[in-house]
Regions:
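SAM-dependent transferase fold signal centered on methyltransferase-like domains
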Residues: 1-167
Length: 167
């Protein structure tokens, strides 16, 4: 979605700045600030995501600087890349906007926003929205041989303890 918005804005000589992005089930919510002009390097925020169907390796390439895809983690020749895009590969959240929302005196009033919305803002502020790679919990469960997807909190904790980013 952001990739399409960016391409449309660029055709008009405008730039974009994602303010916040999140999903509610199958619905994606995106808030974008339109800019009068492209910002330096903005064109490097559109790219392709390749994912190996066998081993799950993921690689991102900037659309402007495409090269050949590297080998995945599969034994020689066993893997196959599935390429998606063009996609927005830049940040999905603007931390200043999120901090301003959380610090707004009106939102501090009792009942101004729900606890669920407060938690969402906290999660968005903690998640920079990059890199542009992702794993679905049901796929992780399938690959690990579990009976079903693990609890999201347990999964995030385990991934962080292993030294990786998870939100």
């Amino acid at each position: 979605q952001l990739g399409l918005v960016a391409r449309q804005a660029w055709m008009l000589g405008r730039g974009i700045q994602p303010l916040l992005c999140f999903s509610e089930g199958r619905t994606f919510r995106v808030s974008v600030r339109m800019r009068r002009h492209l910002q330096p390097g903005e064109e490097h925020r559109l790219g392709l995501l390749a994912r190996c169907e066998a081993c799950g390796s993921q690689v991102v390439q900037i659309l402007k600087n495409l090269t050949g895809w590297p080998s995945c983690c599969c034994p020689s020749g066993a893997g196959r890349w599935s390429v998606s895009g063009p996609l927005w590969i830049g940040p999905l959240q603007d931390l200043q906007t999120l901090a301003a929302l959380r610090g707004d005196p009106w939102l501090q009033e009792p009942g101004a926003i729900s606890n669920r919305t407060k938690r969402l803002l906290e999660r968005l502020e903690a998640d920079p929205g990059s890199p542009a790679t992702v794993w679905a919990t049901d796929e992780l469960a399938r690959r690990l041989g579990g009976g079903g997807p693990p609890s999201l909190n347990q999964l995030v904790t385990a991934v962080r303890q292993a030294g990786f980013q998870a939100y």
